[in-house]
Regions:
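Ferredoxin-like alpha/beta domains used as RNA- or RNAP-binding modules
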Residues: 1-200, 223, 236, 243-254
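Accessory, usually C-terminal, subdomains that scaffold auxiliary metal cofactors
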Residues: 204-254
Length: 254
């Protein structure tokens, strides 16, 4: 049995962690790989951090492509081979499915929120949906649990005012945009969030403070509303609508 009380103590995502612990105990009893629903980045970060030191249980995560934000967790006994970092484009045994949502959105453009709303409106729960990739005028692609593909093909027929057709595609057919890498060197007097983020995103510090105070800024997937919050090497900073950056290293000047 897992030390549930200790693992749950002080957890921010207590309900999510409790469900994952249930799955972990199931994996220990059955000697099978057990998969969670899709989790958000902060949920994944907390679960992995709290389960990291368990010698009897191993945890992996996969969302359909390397940069996926929403992912499913795989749990298995430490004696069971578990590697979700399969290099094949469509690894077998990983319960993820990709769908194409095709329509003509030239005169009624749809956003990520529109496609998510249409999926939820069709009757699918949020935790059954992974990342959604908007393709402009032609529609979108989404990653979902495999058991919902046929249901969505029948029940998702419209996004905004646009009729759509849903079909299954291979994970290797996802239109993944490779992450854009740009090196930025900046000399800052401190590692305050507002100072580092304003330099990284190329906007004024006062504007960055406003973004932070509005809750638009996340550090390592957690919303931060204090401009004076201290960041460090390897931290991710994301701003809604602007993208994300990672602090590669911090060098002291003399």
């Amino acid at each position: 049995m897992l030390p549930r009380a200790d693992l749950l103590q002080g957890a921010e995502y207590r309900e999510t962690l409790a469900r994952v612990l249930d799955l972990g105990e199931q994996a220990l009893k059955t000697w099978q790989v057990v998969w969670s629903d899709f989790l958000s980045p902060p949920e994944i970060a907390e679960v992995q951090a709290r389960l990291r030191n368990l010698t009897e249980l191993q945890v992996g995560a996969w969302g359909g492509y390397p940069q996926a934000e929403r992912q499913r967790l795989a749990l298995a006994r430490s004696e069971v081979g578990l590697d979700v970092r399969d290099p094949k484009p469509d690894p077998e045994g990983i319960p993820l499915a990709a769908i194409q949502i095709q329509g003509n959105f030239l005169f009624d453009p749809a956003t990520h929120r529109d496609f998510l709303g249409a999926l939820l409106g069709a009757g699918i729960a949020r935790e059954k949906v992974g990342d959604i990739l908007v393709l402009g005028d032609s529609g979108a692609q989404a990653i979902v649990v495999p058991e919902m593909v046929d249901y969505l093909a029948l029940n998702l027929t419209q996004v905004r005012t646009v009729p759509v057709k849903v079909s299954r595609i291979l994970l290797s057919q996802l239109n993944i945009q490779p992450p854009r890498v740009k090196s930025i060197t900046s000399v800052e007097a401190s590692l305050r969030l507002d100072a580092v983020a304003s330099a990284g995103f190329g906007i004024s510090r006062s504007k960055m403070v406003e973004e932070i105070q509005r809750g638009e800024v996340r550090v390592n997937w957690k919303p931060i509303t204090q401009a004076s919050y201290t960041v460090g090497p390897q931290d991710w900073i994301a701003i809604r609508g602007r993208g994300r950056l990672q602090i590669e290293e911090v060098a002291e000047t003399k």
